[in-house]
Regions:
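Bacterial N-terminal signal peptides that target proteins for export
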Residues: 2-12
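Bacterial N-terminal signal peptides
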Residues: 11-23
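Bacterial Sec-dependent signal peptides at the C-terminal "C-region" and cleavage site
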Residues: 20-32
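Non-catalytic cap/lid and distal C-terminal segments of serine-dependent acyl enzymes
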Residues: 27-28, 38-73, 78-381
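Short, motif-level signal for alpha-helix interfacial/capping segments enriched in acidic residues
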Residues: 35
Length: 381
């Protein structure tokens, strides 16, 4: 290509870029820039105080809720003369938090923040407060595994199902069969939640890079394949368990390089997923070596039904053959704390052996991420 042709090519490219830039600035003919166009919705000061803002000039009330607040419920924002609503809270400890705005009673996500958590009930925003305490979930210069969204046909459901699957760094070169951790979300979330709000893949990357855990495949399924959140006693009426054992496990074991014995399987779940973990330990103990319910426990009426209808299951000696039955809670402010204590009392009554753990951050992903940091290194040893 001669010099003139190169110059013409450069000028043409520059003209296209300028044209697109002009369109981007103008947006639409006659449109005017608003304070919201240049708004930075999250500002974190040196002392870790967080200011959240949203442009809503016609709103009469705006609140924000999230797990960075010290209590449940929303915090009111104040409106300035430009129509920007803001609130400053903190200092906020370094970690990853979710939040939602409510504008005149309507939940809205932050339009200036592309970091979101996908859930069964919609989207929430994510906000990272940097600092040493948040190092465990940081995206570091270490080997990274792959996080895949996988769609497959589930015969028991008669439809296609989605699952998130993590494979460790260098998976393609690993010849040995790998163990599998099935990692279940809670009632308001879906199969993406452990990867977004949970940051599971980055946490596992960091633990592997530090030599703290064994390589494993992590399967994050959707936990509500039926009509919704099922919390009844037993497993017969919930389509999840048929889906899990007849569709999901066979798919994973036929498409990935994994071991198929109980010693190669672990199951962990939070909240609703924790109830499913409890059921796995009680009704399917021969299928797993590790069962880890997080921030959960049976409701009082379910405990009574369990004791009346499923005595033989609670007395099953296979339960105590689990290498680990690990029940973790988010401290006394965890909304499932009382149910968890009552469930442990039932286990004590039937001689079911278990270990306990607590991270005092309540019923939040802050607790569950730290749970993952603690239990992942224990598995498959």
């Amino acid at each position: 290509m001669n010099r003139l042709a190169k110059q013409l090519k450069f000028l043409l490219a520059a003209g296209i870029l300028i044209s697109f830039s002009t369109v981007g600035l103008a947006q639409f003919p006659g449109a005017k820039l608003t304070p919201g166009d240049t708004l930075k919705s999250i500002r974190i000061s040196a002392d870790k105080k967080v200011t959240l803002s949203i442009y809503a000039p016609k709103a009469s009330e705006v609140t924000v809720s999230g797990d960075f607040l010290q209590s449940y419920g929303g915090q009111k924002l104040k409106k300035d003369e430009l129509g920007i609503w803001s609130v400053t809270v903190g200092p906020v400890a370094p970690d990853l938090y979710s939040y939602d705005f409510s504008v005149d009673g309507m939940k809205v996500i932050d339009p200036k923040n592309i970091q979101v958590k996908e859930g069964a009930g919609g989207y929430s925003n994510l906000m990272e407060v940097p600092g040493k305490e948040a190092d465990y979930l940081a995206v570091k210069n270490v080997p990274h595994g792959n996080l895949e969204k996988v769609w497959f046909y589930a015969g028991t459901l008669g439809k296609t199902s989605r699952v998130h699957i993590y494979t460790p760094p260098g998976y393609e070169k690993i010849k040995d069969k790998l163990p599998v951790l099935y990692l279940q979300h809670g009632g308001g979330d879906n199969d993406a939640s452990w990867a977004t709000a949970g940051r599971a893949n980055f946490i596992l990357d960091n633990l592997l890079a530090e030599g703290k855990m064994k390589p494993m495949i992590v399967v994050m399924p959707f936990g509500n394949p039926g009509s919704g959140f099922f919390s009844g006693a037993g497993v017969e009426a919930d389509p999840y368990y048929s889906y899990f054992f007849k569709d999901l496990v066979p798919y994973v074991e036929s498409h990935y390089n994994v071991g198929t014995s109980r010693e190669n399987r672990a199951y962990a779940g939070l909240s609703m997923g924790g109830l499913q973990a409890l059921n796995m330990g009680i009704f399917y103990p021969e299928k797993f070596a590790y069962v880890l319910p997080l921030s959960t426990g049976f409701f009082p009426e379910i405990l009574q039904s369990m004791e009346e209808k499923y005595t033989s299951n609670l007395k099953n000696s296979e339960i105590n053959k689990l290498k680990l039955f690990w029940i973790a809670m988010g401290g006394e402010k965890d909304i499932a704390y009382k149910n968890g204590e009552n469930t442990k009392a039932l286990f004590d009554k039937f001689g079911i052996k278990y270990q306990t753990n607590s991270y005092p951050a309540g019923h939040t992903f802050i607790t569950w991420r730290h749970n993952l940091v603690e239990f992942a290194p224990i598995l498959f040893r």
